[in-house]
Protein backbone atom coordinates (compact mmCIF):
# COMPACT_ATOMS: atom_id res chain seq x y z
CA UNK A 1 0.00 0.00 0.00
CA UNK A 2 1.51 3.29 -1.09
CA UNK A 3 1.76 6.16 1.37
CA UNK A 4 -0.59 8.97 0.49
CA UNK A 5 -2.06 12.18 1.85
CA UNK A 6 -5.71 12.02 2.93
CA UNK A 7 -7.81 15.07 3.77
CA UNK A 8 -10.40 14.46 6.47
CA UNK A 9 -12.93 16.64 8.24
CA UNK A 10 -13.48 16.20 11.94
CA UNK A 11 -14.24 17.89 15.23
CA UNK A 12 -12.33 17.84 18.48
CA UNK A 13 -12.46 19.65 21.79
CA UNK A 14 -9.67 22.11 22.48
CA UNK A 15 -8.75 23.57 25.84
CA UNK A 16 -8.38 27.27 25.04
CA UNK A 17 -6.29 29.56 27.27
CA UNK A 18 -9.47 31.41 28.21
CA UNK A 19 -11.14 28.19 29.36
CA UNK A 20 -8.03 27.22 31.30
CA UNK A 21 -8.13 30.57 33.05
CA UNK A 22 -11.82 30.18 33.91
CA UNK A 23 -11.27 26.75 35.45
CA UNK A 24 -8.20 27.94 37.34
CA UNK A 25 -10.09 30.85 38.89
CA UNK A 26 -13.01 28.56 39.74
CA UNK A 27 -10.94 26.32 41.98
CA UNK A 28 -8.99 29.07 43.77
CA UNK A 29 -9.79 29.92 47.37
CA UNK A 30 -10.74 33.50 48.17
CA UNK A 31 -7.29 34.37 49.47
CA UNK A 32 -5.60 32.83 46.43
CA UNK A 33 -8.08 34.61 44.17
CA UNK A 34 -7.27 37.94 45.79
CA UNK A 35 -3.61 37.30 45.03
CA UNK A 36 -4.46 36.37 41.44
CA UNK A 37 -6.54 39.53 40.98
CA UNK A 38 -3.78 41.69 42.39
CA UNK A 39 -1.27 40.14 39.98
CA UNK A 40 -3.66 40.78 37.08
CA UNK A 41 -4.10 44.41 38.16
CA UNK A 42 -0.34 44.86 38.39
CA UNK A 43 0.37 43.32 34.98
CA UNK A 44 -2.57 44.56 32.88
CA UNK A 45 -3.07 48.34 32.56
CA UNK A 46 -6.55 47.79 31.09
CA UNK A 47 -7.84 46.45 34.42
CA UNK A 48 -8.71 48.59 37.40
CA UNK A 49 -10.72 48.32 40.58
CA UNK A 50 -14.10 49.98 40.37
CA UNK A 51 -13.37 52.11 43.43
CA UNK A 52 -10.35 53.54 41.55
CA UNK A 53 -12.67 54.92 38.83
CA UNK A 54 -13.01 58.27 40.57
CA UNK A 55 -9.78 59.39 38.88
CA UNK A 56 -11.45 59.17 35.47
CA UNK A 57 -14.76 60.82 36.18
CA UNK A 58 -13.85 64.08 34.42
CA UNK A 59 -15.11 64.73 30.86
CA UNK A 60 -11.55 65.37 29.70
CA UNK A 61 -10.60 61.74 30.24
CA UNK A 62 -13.83 60.09 29.16
CA UNK A 63 -14.56 62.05 26.02
CA UNK A 64 -17.15 64.59 25.23
CA UNK A 65 -20.06 62.55 26.62
CA UNK A 66 -18.25 61.73 29.84
CA UNK A 67 -19.65 58.15 29.86
CA UNK A 68 -17.82 55.27 31.44
CA UNK A 69 -18.34 51.52 31.40
CA UNK A 70 -18.05 49.24 34.35
CA UNK A 71 -17.69 45.48 34.18
CA UNK A 72 -18.81 44.42 37.62
CA UNK A 73 -17.64 41.03 38.81
CA UNK A 74 -20.69 40.70 41.03
CA UNK A 75 -23.50 38.48 39.64
CA UNK A 76 -26.64 40.37 38.76
CA UNK A 77 -24.94 43.74 38.30
CA UNK A 78 -22.92 43.41 35.11
CA UNK A 79 -23.12 46.59 33.07
CA UNK A 80 -21.15 46.02 29.93
CA UNK A 81 -20.64 48.25 26.90
CA UNK A 82 -18.73 51.33 26.00
CA UNK A 83 -20.15 54.57 24.76
CA UNK A 84 -18.46 56.98 22.37
CA UNK A 85 -15.33 57.50 24.45
CA UNK A 86 -13.67 54.07 23.80
CA UNK A 87 -12.42 52.29 20.73
CA UNK A 88 -12.80 48.72 19.49
CA UNK A 89 -9.99 46.29 18.74
CA UNK A 90 -10.36 46.83 15.03
CA UNK A 91 -10.49 50.60 15.42
CA UNK A 92 -13.23 53.18 15.60
CA UNK A 93 -15.59 53.37 18.51
CA UNK A 94 -17.26 50.49 20.28
CA UNK A 95 -21.01 50.54 20.01
CA UNK A 96 -23.09 49.25 22.91
CA UNK A 97 -23.19 45.46 22.99
CA UNK A 98 -19.93 45.02 21.05
CA UNK A 99 -18.30 43.69 24.19
CA UNK A 100 -19.98 40.34 23.56
CA UNK A 101 -18.85 39.88 19.95
CA UNK A 102 -15.82 37.82 20.86
CA UNK A 103 -16.86 36.64 24.31
CA UNK A 104 -19.49 33.89 24.72
CA UNK A 105 -22.27 34.64 27.16
CA UNK A 106 -21.37 31.56 29.19
CA UNK A 107 -17.89 30.22 29.72
CA UNK A 108 -17.83 26.41 29.38
CA UNK A 109 -16.29 25.76 32.77
CA UNK A 110 -18.09 22.43 33.03
CA UNK A 111 -15.29 20.09 32.04
CA UNK A 112 -13.43 17.12 33.35
CA UNK A 113 -10.06 18.81 32.96
CA UNK A 114 -8.31 18.36 36.29
CA UNK A 115 -4.68 19.36 36.21
CA UNK A 116 -4.38 22.91 34.91
CA UNK A 117 -3.35 24.55 38.16
CA UNK A 118 -1.96 23.47 41.49
CA UNK A 119 -3.04 25.88 44.18
CA UNK A 120 -0.42 26.89 46.70
CA UNK A 121 -0.51 28.81 49.92
CA UNK A 122 -0.24 32.51 49.36
CA UNK A 123 0.03 35.51 51.60
CA UNK A 124 -2.98 37.70 52.14
CA UNK A 125 -2.39 41.14 50.64
CA UNK A 126 -2.61 44.18 52.87
CA UNK A 127 -6.22 44.84 53.75
CA UNK A 128 -8.33 47.69 54.97
CA UNK A 129 -9.60 47.88 58.52
CA UNK A 130 -13.13 46.90 57.54
CA UNK A 131 -12.17 43.76 55.60
CA UNK A 132 -13.79 40.49 56.66
CA UNK A 133 -11.87 38.85 59.50
CA UNK A 134 -14.26 36.28 60.98
CA UNK A 135 -11.88 33.58 62.21
CA UNK A 136 -8.52 35.10 63.15
CA UNK A 137 -6.71 33.27 65.89
CA UNK A 138 -5.09 35.73 68.31
CA UNK A 139 -1.36 35.59 68.69
CA UNK A 140 0.85 36.90 71.49
CA UNK A 141 3.54 37.77 68.96
CA UNK A 142 6.22 36.12 71.15
CA UNK A 143 7.77 32.70 70.77
CA UNK A 144 8.41 30.39 73.70
CA UNK A 145 12.17 30.61 73.17
CA UNK A 146 12.19 34.41 73.22
CA UNK A 147 10.06 34.38 76.37
CA UNK A 148 12.52 32.05 78.11
CA UNK A 149 15.56 34.00 76.87
CA UNK A 150 14.01 37.19 78.25
CA UNK A 151 13.79 35.54 81.68
CA UNK A 152 17.32 34.20 81.28
CA UNK A 153 18.66 37.72 80.76
CA UNK A 154 17.16 38.69 84.13
CA UNK A 155 18.77 35.73 85.91
CA UNK A 156 22.28 36.16 87.43
CA UNK A 157 24.47 33.42 86.02
CA UNK A 158 28.05 32.79 84.88
CA UNK A 159 28.93 32.99 81.19
CA UNK A 160 29.39 29.22 80.99
CA UNK A 161 26.06 28.50 82.66
CA UNK A 162 24.39 31.06 80.40
CA UNK A 163 25.76 29.25 77.35
CA UNK A 164 24.40 25.95 78.71
CA UNK A 165 21.04 27.59 79.38
CA UNK A 166 20.79 28.93 75.82
CA UNK A 167 21.56 25.44 74.48
CA UNK A 168 18.88 23.94 76.71
CA UNK A 169 16.30 26.54 75.67
CA UNK A 170 17.02 25.81 72.01
CA UNK A 171 16.13 22.16 72.71
CA UNK A 172 12.69 22.94 74.17
CA UNK A 173 9.78 22.26 71.80
CA UNK A 174 6.61 24.29 71.39
CA UNK A 175 4.80 22.23 74.06
CA UNK A 176 7.49 23.16 76.59
CA UNK A 177 9.29 19.80 76.82
CA UNK A 178 13.04 19.22 76.55
CA UNK A 179 13.52 17.14 73.41
CA UNK A 180 17.23 16.33 73.67
CA UNK A 181 18.83 14.20 76.38
CA UNK A 182 21.23 15.94 78.74
CA UNK A 183 24.07 13.79 77.40
CA UNK A 184 23.41 15.07 73.88
CA UNK A 185 23.37 18.67 75.09
CA UNK A 186 26.65 18.10 76.93
CA UNK A 187 28.21 16.62 73.78
CA UNK A 188 27.16 19.68 71.76
CA UNK A 189 29.11 22.04 74.05
CA UNK A 190 32.73 23.00 73.50
CA UNK A 191 34.93 20.42 75.31
CA UNK A 192 37.32 23.21 76.28
CA UNK A 193 34.67 24.59 78.63
CA UNK A 194 35.15 21.55 80.86
CA UNK A 195 31.43 21.24 81.61
CA UNK A 196 30.22 18.16 83.52
CA UNK A 197 26.81 16.49 83.28
CA UNK A 198 25.80 17.55 86.80
CA UNK A 199 26.40 21.20 85.83
CA UNK A 200 24.02 20.82 82.87
CA UNK A 201 21.46 19.28 85.23
CA UNK A 202 21.85 22.19 87.65
CA UNK A 203 21.24 24.77 84.89
CA UNK A 204 18.20 22.78 83.74
CA UNK A 205 16.72 23.00 87.24
CA UNK A 206 17.10 26.78 87.17
CA UNK A 207 15.31 26.97 83.82
CA UNK A 208 12.54 24.77 85.22
CA UNK A 209 11.82 27.57 87.69
CA UNK A 210 10.95 29.92 84.81
CA UNK A 211 7.43 30.72 83.71
CA UNK A 212 5.22 29.08 82.58
CA UNK A 213 5.18 26.48 85.33
CA UNK A 214 6.18 23.00 84.18
CA UNK A 215 8.57 24.21 81.48
CA UNK A 216 11.68 22.28 80.34
CA UNK A 217 10.43 18.94 81.69
CA UNK A 218 11.62 15.69 80.13
CA UNK A 219 8.26 13.93 80.37
CA UNK A 220 4.68 14.51 81.48
CA UNK A 221 5.28 13.24 85.01
CA UNK A 222 8.13 15.70 85.59
CA UNK A 223 6.10 18.58 84.11
CA UNK A 224 3.17 17.90 86.45
CA UNK A 225 5.51 17.63 89.43
CA UNK A 226 7.12 20.96 88.55
CA UNK A 227 3.70 22.60 88.46
CA UNK A 228 2.65 21.00 91.75
CA UNK A 229 5.84 22.21 93.47
CA UNK A 230 4.97 25.80 92.59
CA UNK A 231 1.60 25.58 94.35
CA UNK A 232 1.21 26.88 97.92
CA UNK A 233 2.29 24.25 100.50
CA UNK A 234 -1.14 24.32 102.15
CA UNK A 235 -2.93 23.28 98.95
CA UNK A 236 -5.34 20.41 99.83
CA UNK A 237 -4.23 16.95 98.66
CA UNK A 238 -0.94 18.33 97.32
CA UNK A 239 1.29 15.50 98.58
CA UNK A 240 -1.11 12.84 97.28
CA UNK A 241 -1.16 14.54 93.88
CA UNK A 242 2.65 14.54 93.80
CA UNK A 243 2.67 10.82 94.59
CA UNK A 244 0.15 10.14 91.85
CA UNK A 245 2.07 12.20 89.27
CA UNK A 246 5.35 10.52 90.16
CA UNK A 247 4.37 6.86 90.50
CA UNK A 248 0.84 6.15 89.24
CA UNK A 249 0.25 8.33 86.20
CA UNK A 250 -0.12 5.25 83.98
CA UNK A 251 -3.00 3.96 86.12
CA UNK A 252 -4.74 7.32 85.86
CA UNK A 253 -4.27 7.31 82.09
CA UNK A 254 -5.86 3.85 81.88
CA UNK A 255 -8.75 4.93 84.13
CA UNK A 256 -7.94 2.05 86.47
CA UNK A 257 -9.42 3.74 89.53
CA UNK A 258 -9.77 0.51 91.52
CA UNK A 259 -6.06 -0.24 91.29
CA UNK A 260 -5.26 3.43 91.89
CA UNK A 261 -7.26 3.50 95.14
CA UNK A 262 -5.59 0.26 96.26
CA UNK A 263 -2.05 1.46 95.50
CA UNK A 264 -2.50 4.92 97.04
CA UNK A 265 -4.62 3.58 99.91
CA UNK A 266 -7.31 6.17 99.34
CA UNK A 267 -11.08 5.92 99.33
CA UNK A 268 -13.12 7.02 96.33
CA UNK A 269 -14.15 10.30 97.92
CA UNK A 270 -10.47 10.97 98.77
CA UNK A 271 -9.14 10.07 95.33
CA UNK A 272 -11.59 12.36 93.55
CA UNK A 273 -10.05 15.71 94.73
CA UNK A 274 -6.55 14.36 94.01
CA UNK A 275 -7.52 13.64 90.41
CA UNK A 276 -9.21 17.03 90.13
CA UNK A 277 -5.99 18.70 91.25
CA UNK A 278 -4.01 16.79 88.61
CA UNK A 279 -6.56 17.69 85.96
CA UNK A 280 -6.22 21.38 86.81
CA UNK A 281 -2.59 21.30 85.61
CA UNK A 282 -1.43 22.00 82.07
CA UNK A 283 0.05 19.00 80.19
CA UNK A 284 1.40 21.37 77.50
CA UNK A 285 2.81 24.36 79.41
CA UNK A 286 4.64 25.79 76.40
CA UNK A 287 1.38 26.21 74.50
CA UNK A 288 0.51 29.13 76.79
CA UNK A 289 3.27 31.15 75.11
CA UNK A 290 3.97 29.48 71.78
CA UNK A 291 1.39 30.28 69.13
CA UNK A 292 1.12 29.33 65.49
CA UNK A 293 0.70 31.76 62.64
CA UNK A 294 -2.75 33.37 62.49
CA UNK A 295 -5.15 31.52 60.20
CA UNK A 296 -7.56 33.51 58.09
CA UNK A 297 -10.80 32.32 56.55
CA UNK A 298 -12.68 34.74 54.34
CA UNK A 299 -16.25 33.53 53.62
CA UNK A 300 -17.19 33.51 49.94
CA UNK A 301 -20.92 33.36 50.60
CA UNK A 302 -23.10 34.87 53.32
CA UNK A 303 -26.40 33.26 54.33
CA UNK A 304 -28.94 35.16 56.43
CA UNK A 305 -32.60 34.81 57.30
CA UNK A 306 -35.07 37.50 56.29
CA UNK A 307 -38.83 37.21 56.71
CA UNK A 308 -38.56 33.45 57.38
CA UNK A 309 -36.59 32.95 54.16
CA UNK A 310 -32.93 32.05 53.81
CA UNK A 311 -31.12 34.49 51.53
CA UNK A 312 -27.81 33.73 49.82
CA UNK A 313 -25.45 36.46 48.69
CA UNK A 314 -21.81 36.73 47.74
CA UNK A 315 -19.43 38.38 50.15
CA UNK A 316 -18.89 41.67 48.32
CA UNK A 317 -15.78 42.42 50.37
CA UNK A 318 -14.03 39.16 49.45
CA UNK A 319 -13.43 39.91 45.75
CA UNK A 320 -12.95 43.45 44.40
CA UNK A 321 -15.12 44.68 41.54
CA UNK A 322 -13.14 45.21 38.36
CA UNK A 323 -13.71 47.26 35.20
CA UNK A 324 -11.98 48.17 31.98
CA UNK A 325 -9.91 51.34 32.26
CA UNK A 326 -11.63 53.71 29.79
CA UNK A 327 -8.65 56.05 29.67
CA UNK A 328 -6.27 53.43 28.25
CA UNK A 329 -8.96 51.73 26.15
CA UNK A 330 -9.53 55.07 24.39
CA UNK A 331 -6.00 54.99 23.00
CA UNK A 332 -6.70 51.97 20.74
CA UNK A 333 -7.11 52.87 17.05
CA UNK A 334 -8.55 50.79 14.21
CA UNK A 335 -5.87 51.00 11.54
CA UNK A 336 -2.85 51.35 13.81
CA UNK A 337 -0.66 48.24 13.50
CA UNK A 338 2.14 49.52 15.70
CA UNK A 339 3.57 47.36 18.46
CA UNK A 340 2.13 49.62 21.15
CA UNK A 341 -1.38 49.49 19.68
CA UNK A 342 -1.17 45.70 19.26
CA UNK A 343 -0.07 45.37 22.87
CA UNK A 344 -3.00 47.49 24.04
CA UNK A 345 -5.48 45.41 22.01
CA UNK A 346 -4.10 42.18 23.48
CA UNK A 347 -4.27 43.59 27.00
CA UNK A 348 -7.86 44.69 26.42
CA UNK A 349 -8.85 41.20 25.25
CA UNK A 350 -7.13 39.60 28.26
CA UNK A 351 -8.88 42.02 30.60
CA UNK A 352 -12.26 41.14 29.05
CA UNK A 353 -11.65 37.43 29.52
CA UNK A 354 -10.41 37.88 33.07
CA UNK A 355 -13.52 39.84 34.07
CA UNK A 356 -15.74 37.32 32.30
CA UNK A 357 -13.99 34.46 34.11
CA UNK A 358 -14.60 36.15 37.45
CA UNK A 359 -18.24 36.67 36.52
CA UNK A 360 -18.57 33.00 35.59
CA UNK A 361 -16.91 31.94 38.85
CA UNK A 362 -19.26 34.06 40.94
CA UNK A 363 -22.36 32.88 39.08
CA UNK A 364 -21.36 29.23 39.49
CA UNK A 365 -20.61 29.78 43.19
CA UNK A 366 -24.01 31.41 43.68
CA UNK A 367 -25.87 28.61 41.90
CA UNK A 368 -24.15 25.90 43.94
CA UNK A 369 -24.50 27.76 47.25
CA UNK A 370 -28.19 28.43 46.65
CA UNK A 371 -28.84 24.75 46.00
CA UNK A 372 -26.89 23.75 49.12
CA UNK A 373 -28.97 26.12 51.26
CA UNK A 374 -32.14 24.80 49.63
CA UNK A 375 -31.18 21.21 50.53
CA UNK A 376 -29.91 21.98 54.03
CA UNK A 377 -32.52 24.39 55.37
CA UNK A 378 -33.11 21.96 58.23
CA UNK A 379 -29.51 22.34 59.36
CA UNK A 380 -29.74 26.13 59.25
CA UNK A 381 -32.95 26.06 61.30
CA UNK A 382 -32.29 23.25 63.78
CA UNK A 383 -28.61 22.26 63.68
CA UNK A 384 -26.54 19.23 62.75
CA UNK A 385 -29.15 16.66 63.74
CA UNK A 386 -31.38 17.97 60.93
CA UNK A 387 -28.66 17.65 58.28
CA UNK A 388 -29.86 15.78 55.18
CA UNK A 389 -27.81 13.38 53.04
CA UNK A 390 -26.25 15.21 50.10
CA UNK A 391 -23.73 14.15 47.46
CA UNK A 392 -22.05 16.04 44.62
CA UNK A 393 -24.31 14.37 42.06
CA UNK A 394 -27.41 15.92 43.66
CA UNK A 395 -26.11 19.47 43.25
CA UNK A 396 -24.61 18.75 39.82
CA UNK A 397 -28.00 17.54 38.60
CA UNK A 398 -29.79 20.56 40.08
CA UNK A 399 -27.52 23.17 38.46
CA UNK A 400 -26.83 21.24 35.24
CA UNK A 401 -23.07 20.89 35.67
CA UNK A 402 -20.57 18.06 35.97
CA UNK A 403 -19.65 16.66 39.39
CA UNK A 404 -16.01 17.69 38.87
CA UNK A 405 -17.14 21.30 38.54
CA UNK A 406 -19.13 21.05 41.78
CA UNK A 407 -16.09 19.53 43.48
CA UNK A 408 -13.93 22.46 42.41
CA UNK A 409 -16.40 25.13 43.45
CA UNK A 410 -16.94 23.58 46.91
CA UNK A 411 -13.25 23.13 47.76
CA UNK A 412 -11.71 25.89 49.89
CA UNK A 413 -14.89 27.96 49.59
CA UNK A 414 -16.62 28.99 52.80
CA UNK A 415 -20.17 29.90 53.76
CA UNK A 416 -20.93 32.25 56.64
CA UNK A 417 -24.15 31.22 58.38
CA UNK A 418 -25.75 32.17 61.72
CA UNK A 419 -24.39 28.86 63.03
CA UNK A 420 -20.80 29.59 62.02
CA UNK A 421 -18.49 29.45 59.02
CA UNK A 422 -18.33 26.16 57.14
CA UNK A 423 -16.53 24.92 54.06
CA UNK A 424 -19.06 24.13 51.35
CA UNK A 425 -17.91 20.50 51.38
CA UNK A 426 -19.13 20.25 54.98
CA UNK A 427 -22.73 20.15 53.77
CA UNK A 428 -22.11 16.96 51.77
CA UNK A 429 -22.42 13.63 53.56
CA UNK A 430 -23.31 10.03 52.84
CA UNK A 431 -26.62 8.48 53.87
CA UNK A 432 -27.64 5.69 56.22
CA UNK A 433 -30.94 3.85 55.83
CA UNK A 434 -33.61 4.16 58.50
CA UNK A 435 -36.15 1.58 59.65
CA UNK A 436 -38.94 3.42 57.83
CA UNK A 437 -37.07 3.16 54.54
CA UNK A 438 -35.82 6.74 54.61
CA UNK A 439 -32.30 8.13 54.76
CA UNK A 440 -30.31 9.86 57.48
CA UNK A 441 -27.16 11.92 57.01
CA UNK A 442 -23.92 10.63 58.50
CA UNK A 443 -23.33 14.16 59.84
CA UNK A 444 -26.66 14.01 61.68
CA UNK A 445 -25.74 10.61 63.12
CA UNK A 446 -22.44 12.00 64.40
CA UNK A 447 -24.34 14.83 66.08
CA UNK A 448 -26.70 12.33 67.75
CA UNK A 449 -23.75 10.21 68.94
CA UNK A 450 -22.07 13.29 70.37
CA UNK A 451 -25.29 14.24 72.16
CA UNK A 452 -25.73 10.74 73.62
CA UNK A 453 -22.17 10.64 74.93
CA UNK A 454 -22.49 14.13 76.43
CA UNK A 455 -25.51 12.96 78.43
CA UNK A 456 -24.07 9.59 79.54
CA UNK A 457 -23.32 8.55 83.12
CA UNK A 458 -19.57 9.24 83.64
CA UNK A 459 -19.28 6.16 85.86
CA UNK A 460 -20.94 3.95 83.24
CA UNK A 461 -20.13 5.42 79.80
CA UNK A 462 -21.98 4.11 76.77
CA UNK A 463 -20.22 1.44 74.73
CA UNK A 464 -20.33 1.49 70.94
CA UNK A 465 -22.78 -1.43 70.98
CA UNK A 466 -25.05 0.41 73.41
CA UNK A 467 -24.96 3.54 71.22
CA UNK A 468 -25.84 1.43 68.18
CA UNK A 469 -28.82 0.07 70.12
CA UNK A 470 -29.99 3.56 71.10
CA UNK A 471 -29.74 4.68 67.48
CA UNK A 472 -31.77 1.67 66.39
CA UNK A 473 -34.48 2.72 68.85
CA UNK A 474 -34.64 5.99 66.89
CA UNK A 475 -35.01 4.06 63.64
CA UNK A 476 -31.37 4.45 62.52
CA UNK A 477 -29.71 1.15 61.67
CA UNK A 478 -25.97 1.50 62.25
CA UNK A 479 -23.44 -1.26 62.94
CA UNK A 480 -21.19 -1.10 65.99
CA UNK A 481 -18.10 -0.65 63.77
CA UNK A 482 -19.76 2.32 62.08
CA UNK A 483 -20.49 3.87 65.47
CA UNK A 484 -16.82 3.40 66.41
CA UNK A 485 -15.73 5.06 63.17
CA UNK A 486 -18.05 8.04 63.72
CA UNK A 487 -16.95 8.33 67.36
CA UNK A 488 -13.28 8.37 66.39
CA UNK A 489 -13.95 11.03 63.74
CA UNK A 490 -15.34 13.19 66.57
CA UNK A 491 -12.11 12.63 68.58
CA UNK A 492 -14.08 10.93 71.36
CA UNK A 493 -12.29 8.24 73.35
CA UNK A 494 -13.77 4.74 73.78
CA UNK A 495 -15.95 4.00 76.79
CA UNK A 496 -13.08 2.43 78.76
CA UNK A 497 -11.17 5.73 78.62
CA UNK A 498 -14.20 7.93 79.27
CA UNK A 499 -14.95 6.34 82.62
CA UNK A 500 -14.27 8.68 85.52
CA UNK A 501 -15.08 9.09 89.18
CA UNK A 502 -18.20 11.05 90.09
Curated annotation (Swiss-Prot):
Task: Kindly indicate which segments of the sequence are annotated as binding DNA.
Answer: 391-410
Any Pfam family the entry gives: Sigma54_AID
Q: Where is this region: Disordered?
A: 40-104
Q: Where is the composition biased (Polar residues)?
A: 68-77
- Which Gene3D superfamilies does this one have? Homeodomain-like, RNA polymerase sigma-54 factor, core-binding domain
Q: Which InterPro entries match?
A: RNA_pol_sigma_54, RNA_pol_sigma_54_core-bd, RNA_pol_sigma_54_DNA-bd, RpoN_core-bd_sf
* Motif RPON box location, chain numbering: 479-487
GO biological processes: DNA-templated transcription initiation; nitrogen fixation
GO MF assignments: DNA binding; DNA-binding transcription activator activity; nucleotidyltransferase activity; sigma factor activity
Segments passing through the bilayer: none
Quote the cellular component terms of the Gene Ontology held in the record. Answer: DNA-directed RNA polymerase complex
Q: Which keywords belong to this entry?
A: DNA-binding, DNA-directed RNA polymerase, Nitrogen fixation, Nucleotidyltransferase, Sigma factor, Transcription, Transcription regulation, Transferase
Name the source's superkingdom.
Bacteria
Q: Which PROSITE patterns match?
A: SIGMA54_1, SIGMA54_2, SIGMA54_3
Q: What does this protein do?
A: Sigma factors are initiation factors that promote the attachment of RNA polymerase to specific initiation sites and are then released. This sigma factor is responsible for the expression of the nitrogen fixation genes. The open complex (sigma-54 and core RNA polymerase) serves as the receptor for receipt of the melting signal from the remotely bound activator protein NifA for the expression of the nitrogen fixation proteins.
Family statement drawn from the similarity comment of this UniProt entry: Belongs to the sigma-54 factor family.
**Know the name of this protein?**
RNA polymerase sigma-54 factor
Amino acid sequence: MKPSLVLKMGQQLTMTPQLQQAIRLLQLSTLDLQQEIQEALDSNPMLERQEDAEDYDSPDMLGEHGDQSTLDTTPGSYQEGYESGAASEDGGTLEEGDWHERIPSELPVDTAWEDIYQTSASNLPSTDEDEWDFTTRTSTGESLQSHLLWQLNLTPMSDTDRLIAVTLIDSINSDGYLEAALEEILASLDPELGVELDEVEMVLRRIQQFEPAGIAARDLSESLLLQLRQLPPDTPWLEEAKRLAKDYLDLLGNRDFTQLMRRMKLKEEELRPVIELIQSLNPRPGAQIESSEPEYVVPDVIVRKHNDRWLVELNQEAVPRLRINPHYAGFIRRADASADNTFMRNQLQEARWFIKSLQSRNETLMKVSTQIVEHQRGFLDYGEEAMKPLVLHDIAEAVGMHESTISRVTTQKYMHTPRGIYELKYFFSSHVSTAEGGECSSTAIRAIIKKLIAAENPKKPLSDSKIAGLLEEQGIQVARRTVAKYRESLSIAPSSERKRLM
